[in-house]
């Protein structure tokens, strides 16, 4: 019996380690709740994908022109739907295991360390970048609402509106996981469809403007080319929900007989139909009505009736509240995983309270300091949006499944990779030029 003791101790240690691991997984935001319905994934995906950037699509069309504009809109929709399908398929490709996080899939494809180095920095650039942009967008939309509703009120700085917007997140960020924010996400998804409908329906009711022109606005060839690159980025990065798709799928229950990919794919299809209903009418109707004179936010071109534009701005605020939460959740998960697994903090509500408040405060501070952050993201985001959305899923697919050379799957993946690389190189050039031109007007804490 004495000889058996070390073996028993070893088994006990393993059991303790497994129990601790399960306790941590049951606490972390991505894996703590796995009882989501398929329609949860639909509105989470709509909220993640339809950004306030949809209101800038007519302006992007004016930089691209009819032919290239429609081509990029449709190509981006098709390619990103294909890469999203790949990620949904790969979530449970290893029997008995789920890749609940983007970097776990990367680690399976490229190795433990390399997978982390490839995926995590890009995912963080997108998620933290989007959260900061939404801080500014929420603040700007609140400011616009205030100006429209109370036109003789004393002007209030954008900084204060960003603080007001952030105050909501100091409360909502303490909802523990994706399923607990499903109500917020549903409201956000409905709002995105609502303000998109207001944008294109109001434009259509105005009728085509007199002296409307559809040619390129820039006077020089260089200006036209740079604007084209910028418009390319604006359209392509309107589809950026891939950064949170595995994390959303992780909330859906799964068994060998009924894997999660069925309900998840149903949700994705519904989400993509809603995305098409938001993007295509806004982009095409907005450009058709206003031509190349359209503002970079179509609501600015509409101006009247003031009550309707004010309503649309409040809808934008509600939508970006939901979007912020969707993009913040994987970051909360990474921070909490690091503290609990690597630094051995105990998984407690107090820890979560400090971590999440710190994150909201940090994104609020950056948004207040750099209210022109959206211009910066067009540049930096190009290096992260294109890979995570357009070609990283294809590279992972090729690495794992190794389809036969020159087969349909092989060609489809390589077309997506080339298109994604093309975006990654060209769109930041347009973004950089925008920064250079607008830098004179950049003011900190405006």
From Swiss-Prot:
GO molecular function, one term: amino acid transmembrane transporter activity
Gene Ontology biological-process annotations: amino acid import; defense response
Topology in membrane: Multi-pass membrane protein
Recorded superkingdom: Eukaryota
Tissue expression as described in the entry: Expressed in roots, stems, flowers, leaves, siliques and pollen. Found in the tips of roots and in the rhizodermis of emerging roots and in lateral roots. Higher expression in older leaves as compared to joung leaves. Detected first at the hydathodes, then in the epidermis and finally in matures leaves in all mesophyll cells. Not detected in vascular bundles or in seeds.
Mutant phenotype after disruption: Lower biomass at the time of harvest, but no visible phenotype until bolting. Decreased uptake of L-histidine, L-glutamine, glutamic acid, L-serine, glycine, L-asparagine, aspartic acid, L-proline and L- or D-alanine.
Keyword match Transport: yes
Sequence ranges on the Cytoplasmic membrane side: 1-37, 85-115, 179-180, 249-268, 327-352, 402-409
Induction: By amino acids.
Residue spans crossing the bilayer: 38-58, 64-84, 116-136, 158-178, 181-201, 228-248, 269-289, 306-326, 353-375, 379-401, 410-430
Name of one Pfam family that matches: Aa_trans
InterPro entries xref list: AA_transpt_TM
Any one of the GO CC terms: plasma membrane
Function comment: Amino acid-proton symporter. Transporter with a broad specificity for histidine, lysine, glutamic acid, alanine, serine, proline and glycine. Involved in both apoplastic transport of amino acids in leaves and their uptake by roots.
Family per record: Belongs to the amino acid/polyamine transporter 2 family. Amino acid/auxin permease (AAAP) (TC 2.A.18.2) subfamily.
Protein name, as recorded: Lysine histidine transporter 1
